[in-house]
Structure formats: C-alpha cells, structure tokens
C-alpha cells in the first residue's frame, strides 16, 4: 500500500500514474499523494510514468532520498525522460511526492552569494537558463530564500546537471547552506534556475 509521509497535505488535485515497465506497460498504480517506498506497492522500480495533475518530485531512493527529479505534467516513457537533461543518468525512481507550493505565476526567489544570506543578492521572478548570461558573476550560489512558489535549480547552464528542488513550504523557504538543497547535494554550483510548473 502507498505510504503517506508527514509532509504538508496538497491543497489541490495531484495525480501521477506509475508503471513497472517502460512505455506505460506492465503493472500500474495511480497516486494522489506521496509514496515513500514503491517496493511496498509491489514494484521493484518505476520504469515509466504519467503526471496528470500537479508537480511532483521523484527520488532515486526510498524515503525521499538521493537524486531529485522534477516531474511536471506530461508523459515519461523511460527513465531518461526524467533524467535525460541530468549529467548523471540514474535509472532508479523509488519514491515521490507532490510539490505543494508550486505556483508558476507568483514565484519569487532570492539568491545570495554566500552562505547564511550574506553577500550580493538577486531577486528572481522568472526562469534563467544561464545565471551568468543574466548578470550573476559567480557559477555558485551560497544560499537561497524561496519567498513564493517552488523552483528547480540546476548545476549547469541550460537546465542540466544535478537538480535541486526548493520550496517555499520547506525549511520555511530558507536554504542557508547548499547541503540543505537535498540529500544528494554535491556542490554549491548553480548555473540555471526555473520555476516549477503546476
């Protein structure tokens, strides 16, 4: 049976259908809330999926750990559809949850040059495929405050590399250090950022 985690309850309709084979074949299950361990549902892994409503975060490991993948409305026939722009191809997707605070139209994020919200800062309300091309001098970000909505930050320009999902309703929207970006955070290198679509 699908496990409900202690995260905030979504305020709207969320729906994801997962399959144990590629191209939407084999065993399938629909979810409208979090799943901390797909193996408890009789799957050894998720091989394809369809996001019908809402934004979701998929995780490489159970219990919402490991590499993160943003899953927006659409079809993902194979693992490379959700990790294809990722420089680190990972075929595992073992847990997932809805993104409760995704609000594409009213998103606001402030990035800071150094940890603990120190140094140069820049307020963002739009998508940036290259922070450097838009005027951010560094290829690193020290800390971030999500004032509204949810964002996905990428290690490299063009929305490539590790994905870090930041939400206004987690950590109070405050990410003081790069290690708070996710259990898999390897570096504070961030070179592209975009809003998460609902």
From Swiss-Prot:
Stretch list, region Connecting peptide: 101-106
Residue span, Beta/gamma crystallin 'Greek key' domain: 14-53, 54-100, 107-148, 149-197
Alphabetical UniProt keywords: Eye lens protein, Repeat
SUPFAM superfamilies, per database record: gamma-Crystallin-like (SSF49695)
UniProt region (N-terminal arm), positions on chain: 1-13
Any GO molecular function: structural constituent of eye lens
Alphabetical list of InterPro entries matching this protein: Beta/Gamma-Crystallin, Beta/gamma_crystallin, G_crystallin-like
Disulfide topology: none
GO biological process terms, semicolon-separated: lens development in camera-type eye; visual perception
Pfam families recorded: Crystall (PF00030)
Domain of life: Eukaryota
Function: Crystallins are the dominant structural components of the vertebrate eye lens.
Subunit record text: Homo/heterodimer, or complexes of higher-order. The structure of beta-crystallin oligomers seems to be stabilized through interactions between the N-terminal arms.
Homology family: Belongs to the beta/gamma-crystallin family.
PANTHER family: BETA-CRYSTALLIN A3, BETA/GAMMA CRYSTALLIN
Domain description: Has a two-domain beta-structure, folded into four very similar Greek key motifs.
Protein name: Beta-crystallin A1
């Amino acid at each position: 049976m699908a496990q409900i985690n202690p995260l905030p309850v979504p305020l709207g309709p969320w729906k994801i259908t997962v399959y144990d084979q590629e191209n939407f074949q084999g065993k399938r299950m629909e979810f409208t809330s979090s799943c901390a361990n797909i193996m408890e549902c009789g799957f050894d892994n998720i091989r394809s999926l369809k996001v019908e409503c809402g934004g979701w975060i998929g995780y490489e490991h159970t219990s919402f750990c490991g590499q993160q993948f943003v899953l927006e409305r659409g079809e993902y026939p194979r693992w490379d559809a959700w990790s294809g722009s990722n420089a680190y191809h990972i075929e595992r997707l073992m847990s997932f949850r809805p993104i409760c605070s995704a609000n594409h139209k009213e998103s606001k994020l402030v990035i800071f040059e150094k940890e603990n919200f120190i140094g140069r800062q820049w307020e963002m309300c739009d998508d940036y495929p290259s922070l450097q091309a838009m005027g951010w001098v560094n290829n690193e970000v020290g800390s971030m405050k999500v004032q509204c909505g949810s964002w996905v930050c990428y290690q490299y320009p063009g929305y490539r590399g590790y994905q870090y999902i930041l939400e206004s309703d987690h950590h109070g929207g405050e990410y003081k250090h790069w290690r708070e970006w996710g259990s898999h955070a390897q570096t504070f290198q961030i070179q592209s950022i975009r809003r998460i679509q609902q």
